[in-house]
Amino acid sequence: MALPFARCWNLYRWGTKRWGVTAGESRRGISFKLEEKTAHSSLALFRGDTGVKYGLVGLEPTKVALNLERFRDWAVVLADTTVTSGRHYWEVTVKRSQQFRIGVADVDMSRDSCVGADDRSWVFSYAQRKWHSMLANEKAPIKGIGQPEKVGLLLDYEAKKLSLVDVNRISVIHTLQTDFRGPVAPAFALWDGELLTHSGLEVPKGL
C-alpha cells in the first residue's frame, strides 16, 4: 500500500557519499556502493555494501527504517552515486541468482514501482534462463548469452545508451536506447540468491 508521502520525490536525500559523477571525474568510471536506505526490506547488503542478497520479508530485513528513499513494494536497491555525464563501466557477478534485473534508474523514480516496469528505469532482466531488455514493462529478448558468471554494464550518458557487455570477449551483447532527463544511479532487483557489484573500473578498450 502506498504511503501518504509516496509522491514527495523532491524530498529524497541520499547518504553521505551521494554525488553526481561528471565526465571529468570518471577516468576510472563510476565507483559506488549500494545505498541501504533505498533497499527493500527483503534485501540485505554484504561485503562492504557492494553485494546484495534476497531473503524472505521479515527473515533478514534491512536494518534501515521505512523512509522516503526506500522501495516499498519491490526488491530493489540503488547505488549511492549518481551519473550526470560521461561513459562509465561496472560489472556484476550474477552466477548466484536465477532471477534479477540490473541497469540504471532515475534517482527520483517511484518507490512503489520496480526497475524496468516504468519509463524512468532501464534494465536487463534474467528469469527462467532467458535474458530481456526492459523499459516501461516492455520486454525485448536477448539471445545467445546463457547465464555467465559475470556481466558488464556500459553507460554512455551523452549518447543515452546502456549496454550489456560480455566480459570475456569484451564485446557489447545488447544496447538499450534511453531517455535520461537527470541524474541516474546503478539499479538492482532480485528475487533469489545474490548479486555482487564491481565498480571503479576503466571502460575496456574497444567499447
From Swiss-Prot:
Record keywords: Acetylation
GO terms under cellular component: nucleus
A Pfam family: SPRY
Domain named B30.2/SPRY: residues: 12-207
Residues with PTM N6-acetyllysine: K53, K130
UniProt keyword annotation of Acetylation present: yes
N6-succinyllysine PTM positions: K139
Protein name as annotated: SPRY domain-containing protein 4
